[in-house]
Regions:
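Exposed, low-structure sequence patches enriched in small/polar residues
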Residues: 1-168
Length: 168
């Protein structure tokens, strides 16, 4: 059950009215063995979506290029039919992780969503400087791809997080 206190815009010109909603869906998928260097999942979901229907076809994969470098591509296509209108949303993303040492890595995630026409990127560095204590540096950026020319900046941020484990 999901309750919306106010209307919720899900796509350009399509909003879901306030109110309570229940969902039922059926899903089928095929998973390739995660123990292999190349693995993945293909799936399909069909079911209710607020006052309408949703069909999703998705793929997610994992490729261990080397012992230190891994890529995880994924794509999801949703066809949504609602009383207020129909739309298709495609979300494509790729995650890459490069392990510098057993105690540090650099990871990046790039994602595109067609319904909002946005692309976002997130780059994260993690260093465990002693067991249980970490330093994270994260750079994030989101851009609107709908106007002509270069994608317009929506948001940008840098976060530094420092944790320290105290043992008693």
């Amino acid at each position: 059950f999901e309750y919306l206190a106010r209307p919720f815009p899900v796509a350009n010109g399509v909003s879901i009215p306030a109110g309570g909603y229940t969902f039922q869906e059926v899903q089928t998928s095929f998973n390739a063995g995660p123990q292999r260097r190349i693995a993945g999942r293909v799936g399909m979901t069909r079911g209710q979506f607020f006052d309408g229907d949703r069909t999703e076809v998705s793929y997610s994969g994992r490729l261990e290029a080397t012992a230190s470098l891994m890529f995880e591509p994924a794509v999801s296509v949703n066809w949504v039919d609602l009383p207020a209108g129909s739309f298709r949303n495609t979300v494509a993303r790729t995650r890459a992780t490069f392990t510098l040492s057993p105690r540090s890595f650099v990871g990046a995630l790039v994602q595109y969503a067609s319904a909002s026409q946005t692309v976002s990127a997130n780059v994260r560095f993690r260093w465990e400087y002693q067991p249980g204590s970490d330093l994270f540096v994260v750079f994030s950026e989101g851009r609107d791809t709908s106007p002509r020319g270069l994608p317009g900046l929506q948001n940008r941020g840098v976060v530094v997080k420092f944790t320290r484990l105290f043992r008693f």
